[in-house]
Amino acid sequence: MFYWLTELAGTIPGINVFRYITFRTGGAMVTGALFVFLFGPWIIDHLRLAQGKGQPIRADGPPTHLMTKKGTPTMGGLMILSGLVVSTLLWANLHNPYVWVVLMVTLGFGFVGFYDDYLKVTKQTHAGFSGRLRLAVEGLIALFACLVIIWAGRDSSVMHLGIPFAKDFAINLGWFYLVFGAFIIVGAGNAVNLTDGLDGLAIVPVMIAAASFGMIAYLVGNAVFSEYLQIRYVAGTGELAVLCGAVLGAGLGFLWFNAPPASIFMGDTGSLALGGMIGSIAVAVKHEIVLAVIGGLFVFEALSVIVQVASFKLTGKRIFRMAPIHHHYEQKGWTEPQIVIRFWIIAVMLALAGLSTLKLR
């Protein structure tokens, strides 16, 4: 919305600053943080009142969770999504199709997660939304998003898969790219969802990934920088940095309330939405494989569940004491703050490794 003020650049001194993505990204970050700080307590109070017993705690999980987390409200993702939407509407260029497609994925996945949280809270069960139906809905949202991204790209090379460290090599996936892109988006959403099991564990790596992809989006969307770095230029994607800034701000605000002991949980409302958002940005900026590096922590968490389930079905034995992997370390005696902070450190290192692919070609 503020971007439209640039039309008055000739009449109001200084108004031209709203043209700059970097300025608007900073504005979105501050707005997102302030929104969550101001309205967070009100949202938490209303969710606690509406939910009563709060999020059901796994009986087969670490015993300490039954004592420290019982009664904590969930659906905290509503705080993040509200801050994100308000910030984006204020600071982003709303004529940009990439802004709308990423918002669509974020809110679509957020709605799926909200319904899942609603079923869990009202029925006090972990069953929630049917797994297959949930994946089907997510898949349809992701497929539509990929169609819009292909349309916005306006040339066939948008269906090429870039390879990190290779400046002149890409794999032409053709229309199979639709399926591949949808897999990336759905996979990212559910990987973040699996990571969200300890206070503060998911939100900081999400913010790290958002900051990383905000930088990538800015560089990919800038013809000069993309030529210098020899990465593919995708016109218009620089605007996605504003959304990443909004997530950073809203995430900081949420972390204030989610820091241990958490006053509220993100829930599927937040984890699915934020994962889907990062996945859709990765697809839009043509750095799908780099997502597996920057979001390596999420990949590791998801793989631990896949390996655990496959091993138990095939051999009757479990590889980990408990999955996802963060619960395995809890069972080994690591404290919750140890796990969370160490995983944050891993997320930072992976983000740096992913960003290095921009220069090492």
From Swiss-Prot:
PROSITE patterns linked to this entry: MRAY_1, MRAY_2
Principal location listed in the UniProt entry: membrane
Keyword Membrane: yes
Single GO term (MF): UDP-N-acetylmuramoyl-L-alanyl-D-glutamyl-meso-2,6-diaminopimelyl-D-alanyl-D-alanine:undecaprenyl-phosphate transferase activity
Keywords: Cell cycle, Cell division, Cell inner membrane, Cell membrane, Cell shape, Cell wall biogenesis/degradation, Magnesium, Membrane, Metal-binding, Peptidoglycan synthesis, Transferase, Transmembrane, Transmembrane helix
Catalytic activity as recorded in UniProt: UDP-N-acetyl-alpha-D-muramoyl-L-alanyl-gamma-D-glutamyl-meso-2,6-diaminopimeloyl-D-alanyl-D-alanine + di-trans,octa-cis-undecaprenyl phosphate = di-trans,octa-cis-undecaprenyl diphospho-N-acetyl-alpha-D-muramoyl-L-alanyl-D-glutamyl-meso-2,6-diaminopimeloyl-D-alanyl-D-alanine + UMP
InterPro entries per the UniProt record, alphabetical: Glycosyl_transferase_4, PNAcMuramoyl-5peptid_Trfase, PNAcMuramoyl-5peptid_Trfase_CS
Pathway the protein contributes to: Cell wall biogenesis; peptidoglycan biosynthesis
Transmembrane segments: 27-47, 72-92, 94-114, 133-153, 169-189, 200-220, 240-260, 264-284, 289-309, 338-358
Primary enzyme class: transferase
Source organism, top-level taxon: Bacteria
UniProt keyword RNA-binding present: no
One GO term describing the cellular component: plasma membrane
Xref: PANTHER family: PHOSPHO-N-ACETYLMURAMOYL-PENTAPEPTIDE-TRANSFERASE (PTHR22926), PHOSPHO-N-ACETYLMURAMOYL-PENTAPEPTIDE-TRANSFERASE HOMOLOG (PTHR22926:SF5)
Homology family: Belongs to the glycosyltransferase 4 family. MraY subfamily.
Function: Catalyzes the initial step of the lipid cycle reactions in the biosynthesis of the cell wall peptidoglycan: transfers peptidoglycan precursor phospho-MurNAc-pentapeptide from UDP-MurNAc-pentapeptide onto the lipid carrier undecaprenyl phosphate, yielding undecaprenyl-pyrophosphoryl-MurNAc-pentapeptide, known as lipid I.
Descriptive protein name: Phospho-N-acetylmuramoyl-pentapeptide-transferase
The organism of origin for this protein: Afipia carboxidovorans (strain ATCC 49405 / DSM 1227 / KCTC 32145 / OM5)
Name of the coding gene: mraY
